[in-house]
Regions:
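Aromatic (phenylalanine/tyrosine) cluster motif
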Residues: 3, 20, 33-36, 40-42
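Active-site-proximal specificity loops/subdomain of glycosyltransferases
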Residues: 124-137
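Basic polycationic patches enriched in arginine
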Residues: 16, 25-28, 41, 45
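Conserved NAD+-utilizing ADP-ribose enzyme module
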Residues: 32-33, 38-39, 50-54, 62-127, ...
């Protein structure tokens, strides 16, 4: 058995065993995820800092284009009715991987043996698996970073970075938009390449933790793909 470090113990202490409500669960249509997809983010450190650089977004919901939007009211993962339960399951998976040294893919079936209600191969439950990245990263987010990955909008500093996402499920027909920032509540910029470097077929919780530490430190890789986590008011304008 791999004994946990002090940081691991802190992560373990934050996790409680989830309860599973009876009855059918609501099906979640996953349009912006791939099974074990990774997409991770970039930074502005002060909540009132202006975003002077050009920003872009690949928007799959065309009703959101051309109107004033506010992250306080716009739909996001955190407001999804199943998110809290899914994220709790994934924290449990993450901590079990820390304790056992098993990969995430090895850990999920072992948990499914103990929790029959969790079926990692059921499309209805794949959202649980997708939550692993957000759930794991939140366990390592430092206190001074107030913005999380579940209650924000995601912007890029380059058009090419938006095009990178067209290969993701549900994004092939999304509209490339320029972002007009109306008001900034908070923002953070991180390099999602730390996540892309993870081999999802063999990754353990400690591999994810190492990437998370670099991500939240704002450290850039040799070939960075910076992405902005944004909270505030903004408007999207289509780019021809």
């Amino acid at each position: 058995m791999i004994f946990p470090s002090a940081a691991d113990e802190g992560a373990i202490a934050a996790v409680r065993v989830p309860s599973f409500p009876a009855g059918n669960r609501r099906r979640r249509k996953i349009e912006n995820y791939v099974f074990f997809s990774v997409s991770y983010r970039y930074i502005c450190r002060h909540p009132k800092q202006n975003l002077a650089m050009a920003l872009y977004r690949l928007e799959s919901d065309r009703t959101q284009i051309g109107i004033d939007l506010d992250t306080k009211t716009r739909d996001n993962n955190l407001r999804h009715p199943d998110y809290a339960r899914h994220a709790q399951i994934m924290r449990l998976v993450y901590v079990q991987s820390l304790l056992s040294g098993q990969s995430i893919l090895q850990t999920i079936p072992s948990l499914a043996d103990h929790f029959p209600q969790l079926d990692p191969f059921n499309p209805e439950h794949q959202a649980c698996v997708c939550c692993i990245w957000d759930a794991a990263f939140d366990l390592h987010r430092p206190p001074h970073v107030r913005i999380g990955r579940t209650d924000c909008a995601y912007f890029f500093t380059e058009r090419a970075a938006c095009e990178y996402y067209r290969n993701y499920s549900g994004m092939s027909s999304a509209q490339l938009c320029e972002v007009q920032v109306l008001e900034t509540y908070d923002c953070f910029t991180g390099d999602m390449n730390w996540l892309d470097a993870i081999d999802e077929s063999t990754a353990t919780a400690r591999d994810i933790a190492a990437a998370a530490v670099r991500y939240w430190a704002g450290e850039m890789s040799a070939d960075p793909l910076p992405e902005v986590l944004f909270q505030g008011r903004y408007r999207l304008t289509p780019v021809p």
